[in-house]
Amino acid sequence: MAHKKGTGSTRNGRDSNSKRLGVKAYGGEKVSAGSIIIRQRGTSFLPGINVGKGKDDTLFALKEGTVSFDSIKRNLRNRKRVNVVL
């Protein structure tokens, strides 16, 4: 028989690293071509004028300019859109 009480195991004890998602350049900020505007999972924000979308749904500036946000009605709901105005 054991003289010590055996310790149980736990299924906790691990956590993933943060992915640093969110808006990186806010409305009114100047951005250069290729700079990241928003990192996101899925399309919370849609790309607008002079904005491209990467394979991980990251929005980035295609041209140098100023970031602006607006809202468009699409498929019975309002969607947020990001533009880069020259």
Curated annotation (Swiss-Prot):
UniProt keyword annotations, A-Z: Ribonucleoprotein, Ribosomal protein
Segments of this protein annotated with the region Disordered: 1-24
Record SUPFAM superfamilies: Ribosomal L27 protein-like
InterPro entries: Ribosomal_bL27, Ribosomal_bL27_CS
Residues spanning the membrane: none
Top-rank taxon: Bacteria
Cystine bridges: none
Gene label: rpmA
Family matches, as Pfam families: Ribosomal_L27
Any GO BP annotation: translation
Any GO MF annotation of the entry: structural constituent of ribosome
PANTHER family: LARGE RIBOSOMAL SUBUNIT PROTEIN BL27M, RIBOSOMAL PROTEIN L27
Protein name: Large ribosomal subunit protein bL27
Membership in a protein family: Belongs to the bacterial ribosomal protein bL27 family.
Lineage: Bacteria, Bacillati, Cyanobacteriota, Cyanophyceae, Synechococcales
GO cellular component, one term: cytosolic large ribosomal subunit
